[in-house]
Amino acid sequence: MAKRIIYNEQARRALERGIDILAESVAVTLGPKGRNVVLEKKFGAPQIINDGVTIAKEIELEDHIENTGVALIRQAASKTNDAAGDGTTTATVLAHAMVKAGLKNVAAGANAITLKKGIDKATDFLVEKIKDHSKPISDSNAIAQCGTIAAGNDEEVGKMIADAMDKVGKEGVISLEEGKSMTTELEVTEGMRFDKGYISPYFATDTERMEAVLDEPYILLTDKKIGLVQDLVPVLEQVAKTGKPLLIIAEDIEKEALATLVVNRLRGVLNVAAVKAPGFGDRRKAMLEDMAVLTNGQLITEDAGLKLENATLDMLGTSRRVTINKDTSTIVAEGNEVAVNARCEQIKKQMDETDSTYDKEKLQERLAKLSGGVAVVKVGAATETEMKDKKLRLEDAINATKAAVEEGIVPGGGTTLAHLAPALEDWSSTNLSGEELIGANIVEAALTSPLMRIAENAGANGAVVAENVKSKPVNDGYNAATGEYVDMLSAGIVDPAKVTRSGLQNAASIAGMVLTTECIVADLPEKKDSSPAGGGMGGDFDY
């Protein structure tokens, strides 16, 4: 396919046009009085949302060159979303402000490479300053405040997430599901829960609720298919003598063995239940090993030279209680902290070593199931459109609270960046010179842009608000919801330091790339073929 090649100023201006379009679409959502954006969908109802990165992903322009600008700034939003899970709109607004100011300097003859060096040095200085300003989270109240701000000032959501974090701990997983009612509810599962239910409904001990509840059972874990009942007989006899229930978790249990277990259960010889092992392949084996650690048992696998027919009672795991329904099983174990902690450390090391986001997610789930448990937020809403918007806000809130626990909090509402502008000005004027200093000044000018946009979305004069905030003490900022200047930490208007930091770093990175662009190679728009002639017609000709 033929390409179009554009150089110098023309190339940078084309990128700028794309960046302007995306930044404006996303910036309208910033702050407590930010507006919504409606996304048209090819199928189904339009989506009304307030989430920067989702809007950015939807924007595609007809002009290939302008679209390249959109893709570049979308990357700043996506990278911030990947790192911190929130702050995507702030990153977009910052990147846009840096690009606008930088392009003016490049057009006036400044050296783009030296400007980029100045931008990078200023960013490194600011990252250190953000670390100094951040305050560690001390109580669930601060977590609730973080969640409230990230969810678009929804206090109920903030409190719910703080409760969930309290119950499942820092390593726990908080997942979102679409609820069946109008209200948003929180459900916390203690212990390890996995998505496999009983193999046969005849294992249910509570026929009204169709649940199998086993108190203080033995747990047999194996990664093989159980086909012959003879393999199970030695274990069944040993467990029957103790009078305790037995849970079997295996790859599968085939008809003959299953029938024997069901008959024993119905006759009251042995209270037994069987469940298929969760996951596939290596992941299934890893989850079974996790369960073995949790229940203080052994995974009976031929890889370790263990056979089912030779299994003894001391190879079986134990737990306080097991609850199984048709879809899920929950094991509540206790008293094996040392081994569980060692296993958790091992999983954390694997998380540090892997580059795959998917693997990280799965390892995080395993870690949560072992260490804390799982909290499920069931999102309730009147319509599907509202449900989708709520779900995105909740996702942001969960990510923001996790980021806050990791790196602490800073005053929100664009306040921290605005207060850092004078500090950057002092530092850069003594440590930088020439065009590097101009690069630092570009960053300094951009630092107030999120605050200005928040104020403008609330109907105030952004430039006036920014100057007022700069002259006030470090923690004081502009509360756009009420139009007052307040102590942001006392008012509960906080941002995770990680969100502020990663937004700034990604914005500076993209701005540097745009400023140092000298040539763009893009596809030429395809010419549409003229429509073919219909029967008795002469194509696109006028006769």
Swiss-Prot record:
Gene that specifies this protein: groEL2
GO molecular function term, any single one: ATP-dependent protein folding chaperone
Key word Nucleotide-binding present: yes
Superkingdom of source: Bacteria
Protein name in UniProt: Chaperonin GroEL 2
GO cellular component: cytoplasm
UniProt keyword annotation of Nucleotidyltransferase present: no
BP GO terms, sorted: protein refolding
Role description: Together with its co-chaperonin GroES, plays an essential role in assisting protein folding. The GroEL-GroES system forms a nano-cage that allows encapsulation of the non-native substrate proteins and provides a physical environment optimized to promote and accelerate protein folding.
Record InterPro entries: Chaperonin_Cpn60_CS (IPR018370), Cpn60/GroEL (IPR001844), Cpn60/GroEL/TCP-1 (IPR002423), GroEL-like_apical_dom_sf (IPR027409), GROEL-like_equatorial_sf (IPR027413), TCP-1-like_intermed_sf (IPR027410)
A Pfam family hit: Cpn60_TCP1
Family (UniProt): Belongs to the chaperonin (HSP60) family.
PANTHER family linked: 60 KDA HEAT SHOCK PROTEIN, MITOCHONDRIAL
Places the protein is found: Cytoplasm
Catalytic activity: ATP + H2O + a folded polypeptide = ADP + phosphate + an unfolded polypeptide
Subunit structure: Forms a cylinder of 14 subunits composed of two heptameric rings stacked back-to-back. Interacts with the co-chaperonin GroES.
Principal location listed in the UniProt entry: cytoplasm
Key words of the record: ATP-binding, Chaperone, Cytoplasm, Isomerase, Nucleotide-binding
Residues given in the record as ATP binding sites: T29, L30, G31, P32, D86, G87, T88, T89, T90, G413, N479, A480, A481, D495
EC number from the UniProt entry: 5.6.1.7
